[in-house]
């Protein structure tokens, strides 16, 4: 009774009600479709309905992994029925991402390495997985400079940390270590019945699928940056920001969304987008 839960799928622009009411969602959708969100007052109104920080993180995650069976499909969102409740999205069914279904991708996007996923999520098209209505709210938010800068900097934060090649490769390593000992037995048990052109049914096919994930982890960060340069007409130049914390017990440094509490950290940011850096004292300390 305390939650609105909706789903949208490619066959219709109208949300499917799973729980609660669609009234609040339709209100903000219509507001954003009929008002210029580049105007700061309109943006602030929209931000009262949408959890902007959560929206940005969600969009970045879907775009980075290249889940192209989205946003027209596999899209759910919810809002608490409270005075401070705001719409947030639920990430699920992202198995099209990380170069998972290369054969199927050929019919939709051509190639993971060359397809512009940010543009896919921004402007909308005529395909089942990104009709214009499914990208309209995100597109409207990006008309606002404050939101656009926050999106760009947050994306850079993630590319510098959780979406970096080193970290995603580490995650692949850790998952492979768990799964690999059982792959041969799994294939021997189920054999050819596994094969549907996307599911490896030999050890060589399994190793090839894992290698594609490593390849994706290698090329995707640079491609993601290039997509931002293209869509937002950036000059493409980046600066390396290096941060040093002498005493982590006394405080840490916050850059955009990241809290840095190590002696040496560095990340790449676009030179034409301002970033936020501040020193944050721990309890009992001050700067």
Give the label of every model feature segment.
Residues 234-271, 286:
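Extracellular, modular beta-sheet/disulfide-rich ectodomains of secreted and cell-surface proteins
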Residues 1, 14-17, 21-244:
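Middle-to-C-terminal accessory/interaction subdomains
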Residues 1-8:
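Acidic, His- and aromatic-enriched active-site or binding-groove loops in soluble protein domains
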Residues 187, 276-287:
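Surface-exposed interfaces of beta-sheet-rich extracellular modules
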């Amino acid at each position: 009774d305390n939650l609105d839960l909706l789903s949208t799928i490619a066959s219709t622009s109208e949300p499917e009600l799973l729980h609660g009411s669609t009234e609040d969602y339709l209100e903000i959708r219509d507001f954003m479709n009929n008002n210029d969100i580049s105007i700061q007052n309109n943006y602030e109104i929209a931000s009262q309905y949408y959890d902007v920080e959560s929206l940005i993180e969600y969009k970045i995650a879907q775009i980075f992994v290249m889940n192209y069976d989205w946003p027209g499909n596999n899209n759910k969102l919810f809002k608490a029925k409270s005075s401070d409740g705001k719409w947030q999205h639920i990430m699920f069914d992202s198995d099209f991402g990380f170069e998972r279904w290369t054969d199927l991708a050929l019919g939709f996007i051509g190639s993971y390495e060359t397809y512009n996923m940010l543009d896919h999520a921004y402007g909308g098209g005529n395909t089942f997985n990104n009709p214009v209505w499914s990208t309209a709210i995100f597109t409207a938010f990006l008309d606002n400079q404050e939101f656009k800068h926050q999106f760009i900097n947050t994306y850079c934060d993630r590319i510098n940390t959780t979406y970096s090649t080193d970290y995603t490769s580490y995650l692949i390593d850790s998952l492979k270590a768990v799964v690999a000992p059982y792959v041969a037995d799994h294939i021997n048990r189920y054999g050819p019945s596994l094969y549907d052109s996307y599911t490896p049914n030999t050890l060589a096919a399994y190793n090839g699928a894992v290698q594609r994930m490593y390849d994706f982890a290698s090329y995707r960060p640079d491609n993601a940056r290039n997509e931002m340069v293209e869509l937002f007409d950036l000059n493409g130049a980046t600066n390396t920001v290096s941060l040093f914390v002498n005493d982590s017990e006394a405080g840490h440094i916050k850059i955009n969304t990241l809290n840095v509490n190590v002696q040496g950290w560095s990340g790449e940011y676009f030179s034409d987008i301002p970033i936020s850096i501040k020193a944050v004292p721990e309890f009992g300390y001050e700067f």
